[in-house]
Amino acid sequence: MSGRGKQGGKTRAKAKTRSSRAGLQFPVGRVHRLLRKGNYAERVGAGAPVYLAAVLEYLTAEILELAGNAARDNKKTRIIPRHLQLAVRNDEELNKLLGGVTIAQGGVLPNIQSVLLPKKTESAKSAKSK
């Protein structure tokens, strides 16, 4: 008899997700699965889904921060599609990235052409200067 049956065997370490290893909130494993299933390439490297998840997380955080600011400017505590639209269209780079995207229930940016505004007369200008 060897007597090894009662000794504590090797306990398996707690599983650590690739998202937590990379310090991300977005699911690296799911992104990897979608890259494999999407027929983008025959093979997918180990770093590609981590990088893509990080980029998606950064863009999401950027849009949500700007939308939160837009909601706060409108004295609201909940972000609605209108706030997302205002956030994206008022940011030059995000507007370029999402130029062809329609946000449902987003509305349009308030804009009045300068030629449609009433002309300032001389009497109004002199009254303001006094």
From Swiss-Prot:
What Gene3D superfamilies is this protein classified in?
A: Histone, subunit A
Q: Which residues carry this modification: N6-succinyllysine?
A: K10, K96
Q: What post-translational events are described?
A: Monoubiquitination of Lys-120 (H2AK119Ub) gives a specific tag for epigenetic transcriptional repression. Following DNA double-strand breaks (DSBs), it is ubiquitinated through 'Lys-63' linkage of ubiquitin moieties, leading to the recruitment of repair proteins to sites of DNA damage. H2AK119Ub and ionizing radiation-induced 'Lys-63'-linked ubiquitination are distinct events.
- N6-glutaryllysine PTM positions read K96, K119
Q: What is its main location?
A: nucleus
A single GO cellular-component term from the record reads: nucleus
Query: Record keywords: Nucleus included?
Result: yes
Q: Where in this protein does the record say Phosphoserine is found?
A: S2
N5-methylglutamine PTM positions read Q105
Please give the biological process terms from Gene Ontology that the record holds. Answer: heterochromatin formation
- Where are residues bearing N6-lactoyllysine located in the sequence? K10
Q: Which Pfam families does this entry report, sorted A to Z?
A: Histone (PF00125), Histone_H2A_C (PF16211)
Region annotation (Disordered) ranges: 1-22
The record's comment on protein family reads: Belongs to the histone H2A family.
Query: Could you identify this protein by its name?
Result: Histone H2A type 1
Its source organism is Xenopus laevis
